[in-house]
Amino acid sequence: MNQTPKLNSFRAGPDEDGRFGIYGGRFVAETLMPLILDLQEEWEKAKNDPAFQAELKSLGTHYIGRPSPLYFAERLTAELGGAKIYFKREELNHTGSHKINNCIGQILLAKRMGKTRIIAETGAGQHGVASATVAARFGLPCVVYMGATDVERQAPNVFRMKLLGAEVIPVTAGSGTLKDAMNEALRDWVTNVDDTYYLIGTAAGPHPYPEMVRDFQAVIGTEAKQQMLEAEGRLPDLVIAAVGGGSNAIGIFHPFLDDESVKIVGVEAGGKGLQGDEHCASITAGSPGVLHGNRTYLLQDGDGQIKEGHSISAGLDYPGIGPEHSWLNDIGRAEYVPIMDHEALEAFQTLTRLEGIIPALEPSHALAEVIKRAPKMGKDEIILMNLSGRGDKDIFTVAKILGM
């Protein structure tokens, strides 16, 4: 899966308690602890089981369509006049994003554990669609919790999930977004621990989820590294990805962490600006706290109450971030920067116009940062960006904003 990291490696975490430095861990209700420990034990076995890995690889090839291509964005590179820009085309995967990589891995684990019901949370709907897809593929019932706000703004994905046989439950609590959906899913899990598997979509949650999701997503960076060596004979100077919970980002970052020549940048949702509360930049404007089973950077007020964030992109609309990202930020191995809604929207239009690729609003945030950085870099330098999802789900949102 991932080659074994060397000692003193940035890739060695988490420790046996699921911690990356002071982040991560397992902050869960007592009723869930036996289940979490059971999950960890099964995950350790599966990781080292050649049959599990072979099935995962086969489904990756024949069902997801891996490896995803590495694409040189020739016209975008020419327009910006600086570094060469490459995209890892995760939006070409089955279901249209990176989410399927993790879902296939986790459903194989659920089957292994004898679970007969799948639950999931979703923001943009991409993880919900991927969960409903793998549940259909393996003949298991699936319930997807989705914030009522997101149900409204991601209608095409809601329809897809229902077509795939999933039950979509709109969550009206809080601001009706991803955080609230995750709270409801955790409640369901506590109630139905015996037969239910909670398929978490991002690299957050209690240990072993952040590690497990990362390992299933690391196929992105592992492939990209190989493809980059084939295309350019060397590694990129900069690897960049959008960060909500952070699974697409950790998937492309992780295999490069020990390559000191490679700069790593995660792009957070700056929303309408960092002055107010209408953003989801947990690292840039948040502070460490505990949410959804792990310690990490969160958007919280002085009393530790979780704030309701905002982003034009439903998939980045989460008031926290995966614990490994928090650790990478604190040790200085990765840098995290915000991009505003309007910048992401401009980047979305630029890519569509120049390359004939309609990106999701999530990777449009990463693209906006690429557009800022590329002109300041030399023409002999290389940027690798994770194009984590396609924009079919966002065309109505964008059309509304642009008055089309």
UniProtKB/Swiss-Prot annotation:
Assigned GO CC terms: cytoplasm
Similarity comment: Belongs to the TrpB family.
Organism: Rhizobium rhizogenes (strain K84 / ATCC BAA-868)
Entry keyword annotation includes Amino-acid biosynthesis: yes
Name of the protein in question: Tryptophan synthase beta chain
Annotated function: The beta subunit is responsible for the synthesis of L-tryptophan from indole and L-serine.
Pfam families (UniProt xref): PALP
Database matches in InterPro entries: Trp_synth_b_CS, Trp_synth_beta, Trp_synth_beta/beta-like, TrpB-like_PALP, TrpB-like_PALP_sf
Molecular function terms from GO: tryptophan synthase activity
Modified residues (N6-(pyridoxal phosphate)lysine): 99
